[in-house]
Amino acid sequence: MDTTDRTAEVVLVDYGLGNLRSVTRGLERAGAEVTLSADPDDFSAADGIVLPGVGAFSEGMENAGPFREALVAAAADGQPLFGICLGMQMLLTSSEEAETVGQGDVRGLDLVPGRNVRFDEGQKVPHMGWNELNVARDHPIVEGIDGEYAYFVHSYYAAPDDDAAVVATTDYSVEFPAIVANEAGNVFGTQFHPEKSGETGLQILQNFVDYCLER
């Protein structure tokens, strides 16, 4: 498909958590037209959707509750859905985090089956700073990426039910997924913050924008 005359229209979900300004700037640098929206009706017309996030899993899922149905529908329809940090964790089925703070089982979007788990006791958390990305399999989001460094801030990590969901890994005493994707490939997320990861992050965002145009 010739995408040279098209601009990707991307919706950045505003559910009260996330580095909205820096993610917007990064996407715009990658050539996207970004709409910051708290209206699920905006999702279906977009070329792609970004679910950002900083903070606790339970708060994220509570705030994103009004968007659940629209996000699941968009994913089922094949729209690109990109979760960042907490947004990636919310793509999974559940998280230990809610149980750890006594909130019981909080259900995620269940678009990538699996559970978010805490780093082992004794491991310094949060895992914060630059770390290496090791690509595990092909996916459009990692085009031109392997061995580069990205910026992480997190205490929990994704443990997908299926190893095939792992697109890239990072090592922090334990090897954990840095990028995951669903079986269809249109739902994916990065545990790191591409908007804080310099040229590597910009390449990831560019890959997302290109994928939005090519689907």
From Swiss-Prot:
InterPro entries xref list: Class_I_gatase-like (IPR029062), GATASE (IPR017926), Imidazole-glycPsynth_HisH (IPR010139)
Pathway(s) of this molecule: Amino-acid biosynthesis; L-histidine biosynthesis; L-histidine from 5-phospho-alpha-D-ribose 1-diphosphate: step 5/9
Domain Glutamine amidotransferase type-1 residue range list: 9-215
One Pfam family per UniProt: GATase
Xref: SUPFAM superfamilies: Class I glutamine amidotransferase-like
Enzyme Commission number, as recorded: 4.3.2.10, 3.5.1.2
GO terms for cellular component: cytoplasm
Protein's name according to its UniProt entry: Imidazole glycerol phosphate synthase subunit HisH
Organism: Natronomonas pharaonis (strain ATCC 35678 / DSM 2160 / CIP 103997 / JCM 8858 / NBRC 14720 / NCIMB 2260 / Gabara)
Classification lineage: Archaea, Methanobacteriati, Methanobacteriota, Stenosarchaea group, Halobacteria
